[in-house]
Amino acid sequence: MLENLSTEHRNEKTMNLDEMNIKEILQRMNEEDRTVALAVEKEIEHIEKVVRVVIQSFEEEGRLIYIGAGTSGRLGILDAVECPPTFGTDDKMVQGFIAGGLKAFTKAVEGAEDREELAEEDLKSIGLNEKDTVIGIAASGRTPYVIGGLKYANSVGASTASISCNKNAEISKYAKLNVEVETGAEILTGSTRLKAGTAQKLVLNMISTASMIGVGKVYKNLMVDVQSTNEKLVERSKRIIVEATGVSYEVAAEHYEKAERNVKAAIVMVLLQCEYGEALEKLKEAKGFVKKAL
């Protein structure tokens, strides 16, 4: 029942929200937002367990799949689509599904979130298997679409996790690992795109970033698998080589081109003073970890 969910409760601090001036509204929102990171902090041990499972999936050439409805689904897609340019992944490695399909990203599809079978259809369409990890996202913790997806994922032997913003969430029963970030009442009653959505975004940031670090997509704190898909990212790639090696911009640019715009290879070439082919071989032996290749 909705009345039992803390995300649906009325916030005692905003009973007169419609009487506040603009500055008061913004200050109250900011005060409430400050509580979100602290709520996430309480779940770090559970988030860590999820990251370990995702890393295992990646190591076995499995995938990370997010499923959700509404804001939760959109946040999953947002995290997924940022992985290729940031970490050099293909677009299959991390994927997001939203109830109602991609058209629901920009316009609500009525009733889609209430149909468990839609998630099963979505996961079947990508050939979900036991190497994959499925993470169900629902602020309320009770969305049928997410429950259906987790049920199907369990049936094929995939790893499962849930992210919700209520304790003892319904979806937690259907996932092997659970992250329950209790964000409490929103300033606008029931509008879980606010604190709950912020919490979900923070957790997704943690999961994808820590998992990519775990499979060698980062050297020191540099995103060395960045894809140079535009002029800004080409410049960033060269700067990463400068930061990682200490050489001049000109030398970094030269090695960047010699390495066929492979930032990792360029770094190894500079630091080991080797040719492109040898750098690739060392990276292959090190399973993509620059530090191990050196």
Curated annotation (Swiss-Prot):
Pfam families: GKRP_SIS_N. Gene3D superfamilies: 1.10.8.1080, Glucose-6-phosphate isomerase like protein, domain 1. The gene is murQ. Its EC number is 4.2.1.126. This is N-acetylmuramic acid 6-phosphate etherase. Residues 54-217 form the SIS domain. Keywords: Carbohydrate metabolism, Lyase. The active site is at E82 (proton donor), E113. PANTHER family: GLUCOKINASE REGULATORY PROTEIN.
